[in-house]
Curated annotation (Swiss-Prot):
Keyword Oxidoreductase attributed: no
Annotated source species: Caenorhabditis elegans
Organism phylogeny: Eukaryota, Metazoa, Ecdysozoa, Nematoda, Chromadorea
Protein's cellular compartments: Membrane
Transmembrane regions: 29-49, 57-77, 85-105, 151-171, 197-217, 240-260, 268-288
GO BP term (any one): sensory perception of chemical stimulus
Protein topology in the membrane: Multi-pass membrane protein
Domain of life: Eukaryota
Gene Ontology MF: a single term: transmembrane signaling receptor activity
Keyword Membrane carried by entry: yes
GO cellular component terms, A-Z: membrane
Official protein name in the record: Serpentine receptor class gamma-15
Family: Belongs to the nematode receptor-like protein srg family.
Pfam families to which the protein is assigned, alphabetical: Srg
Keywords (A to Z) from UniProt: Membrane, Transmembrane, Transmembrane helix
Amino acid sequence: MTTNYSEPDPLVCDETYSSSIEILKYLLTISYLIPGGILHLFILHTILVTRRGYFKGSSFFAIFALDSVSSIIIVFIDSFYGRLFLYVPPLCPIVGPFFWASSLIPKIYFYLSVHTRLSKCVAHICMVLNRMTCVLMPTYYGQIWRKLTKVSLVIICILPLGGTWNIIISPRFYVLPSYGGFAISYVRAIPWASSSLFQSIYILTALVFTFICTSVTLYKLISLSDRIKSAEKSLCFSNIYISLTFLAAAASQALYAFCTSCMSSDLLFTAQFLAFDMFTVGSAVILFWSNSQIRGLILPSKAEDDRIFRVQTINNSFTH
């Protein structure tokens, strides 16, 4: 088979950037990414392991758990690959040639980076629909989502393939100089099918769902607050706060996609990173901060610890 593309030029690291400033950027970035990823891990462990029986009937937490998996992957690959090699210039001449010669690792990183971001968009659509259904049809909400939860989880995993298929079939991935380090790019098998185009489509679609569903949810929370359980109400407000972080990510993506004169702006590039970082780690921080249920389960009070200790002591006394 003949490939109709020209090889990009070999990597030449840009030495005009200050190593100390770029490394400081990296340290500042991981100072919030890694704690946010750890918080996602705690929440995921609580939902799936330590309090599995408590959460297994919750459709919202099932969707949030899958969203947390995407967030953890994003934090891991960005902290220890993407941002590391982008913002630490001394690594560029050492590591860059290796990734230039082998395109498998850059391809895996690039694919995971795009797939998980699209997955988070789809998961967010499912979460705002879940909360809207809760306030619109509180009586039938449980029945509806018992049928929809598994379907939603499959869709969250599969639907991003609609935006990553060209990455899978693309013949060449390579590194290019950026911010003193290097970033990943690729030769598109289908020239028009860029990853940024698909990300814009997914994000803007999620933006429409977010605006409509969140508006309806907020209106119903205000008008029918006495008919909604306090636990469900707390989740609704948590999701509204998460939606605000998504709106910031969507706005920066839309500006980057449709403002051609803005694409070369370092400020917008940084703002886009920060906005999606806020959406990635912010969901865990917001759920922990605004939801007393999840906060109490991750950080139980001394009274709860004493109660668990007494139960364990009683159980042990019966087994001896």
